[in-house]
Amino acid sequence: MRWQDQGIVIAIRKYGDDQIIISIFTQKHGLKKGLAKYSKKATHRLQIGDYVNVTWSSRLISNLGCFKYELIKSTLYHYIQDNLKTMCIAFSTVILDQVLPENEENYIIYNCLDIFINSIQFQDINWKIKYLRLELTLLSELGFGLDLSRCAVNNTNENLTFISPKTGKAVSKTVGLPYSKSLLPLPQLLYDVYNNYEYKYSKTDFKLSLNVLGYFFKKHFLTEKNTILIKYREEIIKLIDLRD
């Protein structure tokens, strides 16, 4: 079994003295893991977020297999000096590595990850919007999508103020106010991003949106064993608070 593709490196683990296990999210073959040779003398050490051309080979598709790769571009320089960007890259790549099924193409998630990473590379002032869209898309593609288009009870699309923590659906102010203590707030920014509206936002809007999305990630994916993901999520919120 042998194929070639292009992808984004989302995890690297050392394996022995001269090998690494790489997780690459590819365009046509989805998430794939494989062994690759590691050399301290290499001109470029593979990093999270690198774009690579890869050749994967194995006797069976279910086997770990081996990678040969060629660097297309490195994005490390564009995020490593910004702790918030680094943590967002870290959280998104780790959770993709943990929850995506192998050998299943998902161009929708791949495209969102690609747009997010490129927004950082090209210093897009709206990179945070691209990140929220990535998280919304990941939840949706894995079967836990939010529905922020209209109220789940009366079907109105006006005054959507809350989100049901059970269903992930929006609830209008009129319907939800008596039950506000048991509902999640619906941040205006998250509503705008979901519905592809124009947006203006502050760090508070970004933080509130991440808190809501974080609730659903914890509900569906993050257990007590996912200490690294929980740590990354907490660090993202702390870093937002430190911003001017």
Swiss-Prot record:
InterPro entries: ARFGAP/RecO (IPR037278), DNA_rep/recomb_RecO_N (IPR022572), NA-bd_OB-fold (IPR012340), RecO (IPR003717), RecO_C (IPR042242). The keyword DNA damage applies. GO terms for biological process: DNA recombination; double-strand break repair. GO terms for cellular component: bacterial nucleoid. Keywords: DNA damage, DNA recombination, DNA repair. Gene3D superfamilies: Nucleic acid-binding proteins, Recombination protein O, C-terminal domain. It comes from the Bacteria. NCBIfam families: reco. Involved in DNA repair and RecF pathway recombination. Belongs to the RecO family. This is DNA repair protein RecO. It comes from Ehrlichia chaffeensis (strain ATCC CRL-10679 / Arkansas).
